[in-house]
């Protein structure tokens, strides 16, 4: 039990002992973890750094979580190693491997466990400059919105270890889907076809399991066409289906308004089960449902980006349906919350989402980011805040998150009401 605590402490000591005072830029953020951001540009006279095909960091964290009220708490610690390699084997052929190992321990039995996440492991072949074929585990992501992505269908069952509630980190730090995917490119758009075969019918929570039962539980397919109407307007049309899945139609739009504002809209429609039906395991008829997220992002001249988003999920419960759940099943509300987390779906019928990212906030090398989501059915909220300070090879991170609302509300029913975490990351 003590080995994880000792390993976390060792990682923190190693990070603190690393040279962190050189006036150079922080290492580039790995593409599979957007919460690590470079802040300083190299001087024009400095030679360009040679790009490496791999990225690797270790991280240690200490966390305190409150359950329902501040008088009931537990502590946990985590030691992680995270790496990615993107190597060219021959001209036109790449091999990509991305993995994260989280060693976790808590003084509350049954809360935490070690988990390894194979995010990506695939070969990518480009027979021509306009064609790409991928085979293996690929993190297939779609969606123009930020907080909620109705067209990101392969997110279901993909998150094994939640290290941050930041939507960007959740999208990156997840298992990919085993697919055969082909893409045809042209100057103003692309056409993509993906096939994901059934490989297992049940998830496997073993530490080093590939967990294909979560990512590939049935045969599925996806067709995507994208086009660029102008320098300021992009569109993407998607069609998704598979074994036991009614076809789903999706649309993504994004456009530039002025020099500092991006507007976006994401929509999906098709027949499917409600969250309540899935949480209770009943066989109710599938109904036509729509999902949507629309909003805008405004970026100021001083590196502050603000995003406002309206979210809608017709599969989510209304206030009356939510309050009726305990009468149907004693654990119906917790079951719905667990189902929405597994599916990465919005647990309410509608919500508002605000996100802010401030790079070089107040002082150079300090990033501040935060979001609040308020669902409109029971008027509860989830809030998250992160402060991240960068040295050359070390990040110091503080995170806080809280679920607020009455105990009968959607987010107020989450048992882990408040969490604070301190972490150190060391780039190798």
Regions found by a protein language model. Give the residues of each.
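N-terminal periplasmic/intermembrane-space "pro-region" immediately following the signal or transit peptide
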Residues: 20-74, 84
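Signature for the C-terminal beta-barrel architecture of outer-membrane proteins
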Residues: 130, 167-320
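Residue-level signature of outer-membrane beta-barrel architecture
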Residues: 85-91, 125-126, 137, 183-186, ...
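Outer-membrane beta-barrel "beta-signal"
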Residues: 354-356, 389-394, 400-402, 414-428
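Outer membrane beta-barrel
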Residues: 86-200, 227, 405
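Outer-envelope beta-barrel architecture signal
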Residues: 46-58, 91-97, 129-131, 178, ...
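Residues that define the transmembrane beta-barrel architecture of outer-membrane proteins
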Residues: 73-81, 114-119, 174-178, 185, ...
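Transmembrane beta-strand segments that form the barrel wall of outer-membrane beta-barrel proteins
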Residues: 59-68, 94-105, 119, 133-135, ...
